[in-house]
Amino acid sequence: KTALITGATSGIGKATAIVLAKNNFNVVLCGRREDRLQELYEELSQYTSVHTLTFDVRNKEAVAAQIGSLPEAFATIDVLINNAGNAHGLDPIQNGSEDDWDAMIDINVKGLLYVSKAIIPQMVARKSGHIINIGSTAAKEVYPNGNVYCASKHAVDALNQGMRMDLNPFGIRVGAIHPGMVATEFSEVRFKGDTERAANVYKGFTPLQPEDIADIIHFVITRPY
């Protein structure tokens, strides 16, 4: 089977790519950072067939063109893992940055839609496929100053439920995984490179690791139909 993973260059996406490659999935790695994609390509090619696509999920033309360019050996996507996502800032709504809001909505919501739109038609035609949308506990509960990020993840949860309703008649499985605190670049990106502030997010407890979520994803997509 072939799995396409967005946001594959770090964190949960990278960990998932490694787990799937070691468990006989062919993998299509998608991300913005070509150097990191190449490193991961070289690492995983010893286990399985690997293809990389470089694009930003916010760019719908690039998404369509890149996914449309997949060679025949990778063109049939059995599993789509919508993992690309981000948080920017942690400010009360009155102090929020419009640029931060745009980034979160464009990546977390619209980017997920653009990638899904490029792949779902082939799943419908085959009447098979599995989509995993990576949400967050923020999809279930809003926390102080999380306003727009939490809204974007609530949207992912709603889209996940809507996709399931729409695609179930075609034999396509759709599910979401909503991680809590996971030790990734997430907080460093949120705080724009402030590593000290990012480290404080995990102070006083042991966060999950990306591999923990990757194991859950692998478990879910390998359950018998």
Locate the predicted segments by residue:
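The beta1-alpha1 cofactor-binding region of Rossmann-like NAD(H)/NADP(H)-dependent oxidoreductases
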Residues: T54-A65, E98
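Conserved glycine-rich cofactor-binding loop
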Residues: T9-S10
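Conserved glycine-rich Rossmann-like NAD(P)H-binding loop of the short-chain dehydrogenase/reductase
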Residues: F25-E39
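Active-site helix of classical SDR
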Residues: S116, S152
